[in-house]
Amino acid sequence: MTAMDHQFPSWIVVNESTSISREQLNYLLETYNVFYENQKNLHILYGQTEDGQLIVEGMLDIFWGVKRPIQLKIQDEKQISSFDLLNTPETFSSKGRMTRWGEFDDLYRISELDRTHVLASEARHSPEDYLSYHSTLTPYADEEPESPLLYRTMSEAALVRKRMRAPEMYRKDRMGVLSNHRASINGHVYDHETSIFTPTFGSETKVRANSIMRTEEVIKQLLQKFKIENSPRDFALYIIFGTGEQRKLKKTDVPLLQRLLQGPSKSNARIFLMDKDAEEISRDVAPYINFHFSFLESILQRLDEEEKMEIERIMAKFNTERAFILKCLQSKQAAKTETTV
């Protein structure tokens, strides 16, 4: 027995009705980490908190199974930086508040920019942008224009280019900013038109969890990772087994320990984030889930027939026993009458 065995309690609580011993935990951790031997970042490890409490920590696989649409937040906790094309101080409010993406909408206009700003912006464009521009607009000549009218025309052409390129560059900047502040769901990040959507069923994500985090805390962690506005109370965690059984985790469950109990293989069991009112599927019903509807109907018909036959058998037995009892009562009553006489 090691010194760590003396420090930590002998039993680890999984939920209000389930606990595992230290020996079981060590075995489960060893099995899990051997399974992911070549993926060290997926290992689940244990240590202790400052107050000496045992804690298990690692990455928890969670699969999307929600049916109700989810709402992505319109903004992140950090202020969004200006996009490359219009990065002048006047672009943003002087107040130190959070910038909403919608505030960029009024930037699609032609403002009076001097020639220096125009040339500086062109120097930052990629060769593809340069070719795209010069395929539709006349390039600048090496020498200065011969008349102010020509200079004004060329300047406006560059400004038109700036306005035409702004939406694409804005989109690139917006996607870049988002990647620094939120995780994407299957490549989906916030968009005004698709901010409300439903993730693909069975798509996988990961969240860092520990043995102190109960079910609701893990849900909050997941929603925070993707900046989802929906309340954690709208969702629940379910374990879906390879047999088809679907069981809802209790509020007192520790999802990370439940993952350890089911083993590392995702083919045996997976943890899903689902709507809180999703139905549970018992172990007895689970084997029939994947059968064809017509086959299930034939099974029900067979069960109905067997039920009717069983009812008829019981009724026949009841009538036989009832007749026998009545006959006995009648014979005893007749014997009593004869004795009295």
UniProtKB/Swiss-Prot annotation:
Residues 190-278 form the Ras-associating domain. The keyword Membrane does not apply. Residues 285-332 form the SARAH domain. It comes from the Eukaryota. InterPro entries: RA_dom, RASSF1-6, SARAH_dom, SARAH_RASSF6, Ubiquitin-like_domsf. Keywords: Apoptosis, Phosphoprotein. GO terms for biological process: apoptotic process; positive regulation of apoptotic process; regulation of apoptotic process; signal transduction. The keyword Lyase does not apply. Interacts with MOAP1. Interaction with activated KRAS is still a matter of debate: interaction has been shown in the mouse, but not in human. Lack of interaction with MRAS, NRAS nor RRAS2 has also been reported. Involved in the induction of apoptosis. May act as a Ras effector protein. May suppress the serum-induced basal levels of NF-kappa-B. This is Ras association domain-containing protein 6. It comes from Mus musculus (Mouse).
